[in-house]
Amino acid sequence: MAVPFNERGGRLRGGIDLLAGRLPSFVFGGAVGRMLPVFHFHDEAPADLEPKLRYLSDNRYRTVTADEIAGYVRDGRAIPERAVALCFDDAWASLWTDGGPLLKRYGF
């Protein structure tokens, strides 16, 4: 099962979700189980994206490919520990020029 996580609704959305208890358990160090956390970025500035990628990298999360996700869904393969999916909406040129180097820097 995919767990969408994004910040639609403004910059305070993550804090509001945190206070309301709507964040997936892995955010607090809990087990993901059979869920795959999906981070959806929409029109994300590099200054906002970098700390999120740094957090994931520093805490040993790894990204999965579309083929791996298909294997989890189609074949029932186990989702590895600390696996996350990163999804980027609106393929602006800056995703390639700014986001690409950040993803590479943090091992994604």
Task: Spell out what each predicted region is.
Residues 1-86, 93-108:
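Terminal accessory/targeting
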